[in-house]
Each structure stands twice: as structure tokens, then as C-alpha cells.
């Protein structure tokens, strides 16, 4: 259960709460010269970057969603998994414009073992929501927000909303009340407001600032202890 947003003001600010069950997934924060990401251990033994930030401003995140049969995994050259698409974007192997061409020309499907939707954004704040089996939407408004339910076809996941899960509504209210001066501090206030506890607790929260070329993050809801990671200039 995760929360992701992009705010397009005088600075492009993105925020993400990574909420997982530690009995299901193994993760660790990875900091490299060109990437900051939450590494997810996969069966191939590698920590994959399905949630992260590239120094070029690309930010990609996957969020769990109740799956639909139209998005079920398929092989073949005309299909691409949402996991591969997101990781390639975070690695800057493909650009935002190339992602747009891919979602227009290929069928985007779930990975074989997980049903996820994605939000991808670039250094200019251009934002794309991708929902396998449903479609995609490029967003132009002041902000974008997604949790674990469909934005493009809300009725498809309405029956699967967890009772009491109002993260989207609470985050939406905070974003609605903000102006152009939306800051890193404001972003962490939002993430703190919608943090999760229990088995699916928030394990990592990060905020990226385009103007600063910096990612700020904290682990395990320790919002009093924010760590700063700045990408080096080439």
C-alpha cells in the first residue's frame, strides 16, 4: 500500500511512501552516482529499481493494485511488463517521450507475480499514470496523486478499497491547499499524514527536488530523521 504524488510549482517536487509487508518483500535503500532507489530483491538475486529517482529527473514508482484479467502477464514482442517499463525509465534507458510511444504501441501487462500500476514523471514535471489492462493518462494539472486504486477506471477497484483507507482523500486535501511555494517540508508533512503502520507499514519515504538535484528520505516512519542525498554534477 503506497502513496505517490508530483507537485508542479516553482519547483518540481515528488513524494513517495513505500508501504510493504516485510514477510513478502526484501528491500534496501540504494544510493548510486546516477540513481537513488528502493532496491527490491527478486528471484534473480538482484535488487531491482522499481521505485526511484534518476539524476536526469526521471522518477518512477510502482504501486500495488487489485489486478484485472485484461492486464494479466503475457509474453511476446507486443507486450511489456509495467515492472520492466518502470525500471528502464528509472535507469534512464528510456525517456518520457519514449515511454509515451511504448504505451501507445505495446500492451502493458503485469509482471508474472505482482499486479502493479505506475506513476512516472520527468524533470519538467510531465506525469504519466499507467494502469495495465485499463490504459494510461498524461496529467497536466498542478499536481498528480495516486495510491492503490485505479484513477482511470475507478469503478474497477472500488469494491477492493480497504475499509478506512482514506489516504487519497487526505493527501488530496493537502495538495489542494498548497500554492506555488510547496516545499520539501510540505511534502514530508503530506507523507507523514498518510503514513501506514502495522504489517504493511511505511518502510521508506522519499521526496525529490528537481531544483536541488536532491532526494531526501527517511526509513520506518522516523520523520524526525531526514537523510539528504544530492546527485553529483557531471
Q: Where do the protein language model's features map onto the residues?
A:
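Short N-terminal edge-element motif at the start of the domain
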Residues: 88-92, 98-101
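Phosphate-interacting basic helix/loop segments used at nucleotide- and nucleic-acid interfaces
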Residues: 101-113
